[in-house]
Amino acid sequence: MPIITLPDGSKKVFEKSVTILEIAQSIGAGLAKATIAGRVNDVLLDATIPINKDSKVVIITSKDKEGIEIIRHSFAHLIGHAVKQIYSDIKMAIGPVIEDGFYYDIFSEYRFTPEDLIKIENRINKLIKTNYDVEILQVSKEEAIKTFKERDETFKLRIIEEIPEEGLINLYKHEEYIDMCRGPHVPNTRHLRHFKLLKLSGSYWRGNSENESLQRIYGTAWAKEKELKDYLTRIEEAEKRDHRKLGKKHSLFHIQEESPGMIFWHPNGWTIYQVLEKYIREILKKNDYLEIKTPQAVDKSLWEKSGHWEKFRDDMFTTASENRTYAIKPMNCPCHIQVFNQGLKSYKDLPIRLAEFGSCHRNEPSGALHGLMRVRNFTQDDAHIFCTEEQIQEEVSTFIDLVFEVYKTFGFDEIIIKLSTRPEKRVGSEDIWDKSEEALTKALDNKNLKWELQPGEGAFYGPKIEFSLKDCLSRVWQCGTIQVDFSMPIRLDATYVDIDNEKRNPVMLHRAILGSFERFIGILIEQYEAKFPIWLAPYQIILLSITDRNIEKCLKFNELINNNGYRSKVDIRNEKIGYKIREATLGRVPLIAVIGDKEEEIDSVALRALNGKNLGIFNLPNLFKLMDELIEKKGRTE
């Protein structure tokens, strides 16, 4: 007689084993109809599996986060059901849930097209309208092997081989189609309604390019029609803002096959990069960082000593010279310790903050590369703070202020903060872990910040705080981080002399605000839709001549504006002024200055903003004053 305890503390007694669906039915028909699965003693369970002992039960519906994930996972199985009905010689690989959706990797000699996506989507719609029950079969490993051998599902058999002999395997039966999964899944397809298949892409079995080539079908699913429509609108907007398209359209950068994952910056894009670097450099200087520069290639012996050779060898580019092997640095920290190690350091010298715009290379898989967001060569706004244990909290607190100042400058006001604490496998004493975690916690709490704890997610060498931005499309980008490191200063012999004249290892704080320049610029391109604020824009103002008579004045003003430190260009083509204004607007230039006969007579320009607003007539001194005010605000309106 299982006693079921519900979230409100109430208890229900049942005479025999009971399913989550039956528990829901005992509460009300409406809840039973909405039930997707349950959480039993903190373990997710299918709605139709019997519970035969006293348990704490939470009923899951589509309103719950777990509910929508279960819906999405069930839709992945529906892809399998549909494609197996439509196409022959199809083998199913894996179909997991991802953020906002799901995908299924499929092996087929037939190459799917966008027209096939429509066909598959129509078949899925047909299947879900039949409202069939999804049966769960809990079988032994031997029975699972037999099932998938009969169906010639090669990839499922490979997965089963990795499963231990003991225990049962969950098979899910969608009419004639059978798939395997940990589950849970919806009990009936009436819970599956609001979905869209999105796109096709290529993939490899287990993500290894040496394995079979697969085809991936992506989809999204939501609990309500409005949520689906809102998401598809966001997807459409994201495609409009795609930094790769805008980068090409506005001649910011390009990537080519001869140098995958490495950026060819064009003058417009490089201007943005340089302005961003200058801004960060000023911020660092104001906060007492010392800028350094370290080599690109370093003998592998240093990477062996630091531990990177053992852990990251496959991700490192190497070269050889005179019988020595060098690694192109994938990160800057070991090199920064070499700078710290030059000369004796006293506790009175700490903290020492070493910063570098460090160019790094990592051998990312070609399939993972994505414009500016995932590259092989990137520049970090990297810094390492060498300090005592007692200084950790103050340094972290100051860094948090710095992060918020920079993000606010770019218009990011919603920052998500996560604190990751000690993992099971770690170095360092419990005492120093206690002190470090307490220091990070206090630094956050003293500022009354909301943050999320991630127990056990810290690195083996110390806890960390991660800072993520939420952009205009509600996408989250993890950028900033500050990481406590007890290990590397010891491995690389970094020491200082303490107050008792004893040598001690400093604590090292790894920290970055942007993460990498490439990725952050990619985020900015999409955030601004390439309509950069005036301080960051490749060109801040464009001068347009109305007639050929005004060309000389345009050129003279352009020279004066550039000589005063602004970024200006001209359009003196023999085109109608309306056409020129439209072109300048499409080119995303923040200020558009028109010079005709009337303006030339009074040595001024007719100024308009990118949004079309007429700003009035300005002579050069007043124009410079306006531009200085706009640049000083850095696009902020407060």
Swiss-Prot record:
Enzyme class: ligase
GO biological process, alphabetically ordered: threonyl-tRNA aminoacylation
Note accompanying the cofactor annotation: Binds 1 zinc ion per subunit.
Pfam family, one: tRNA_SAD
PROSITE patterns, sorted: AA_TRNA_LIGASE_II, TGS
Cofactor(s), by name: Zn(2+)
GO MF terms, alphabetically ordered: ATP binding; metal ion binding; threonine-tRNA ligase activity; tRNA binding
Major localisation: cytoplasm
Record's protein name: Threonine--tRNA ligase
Organism: Prochlorococcus marinus (strain MIT 9301)
Gene name as annotated: thrS
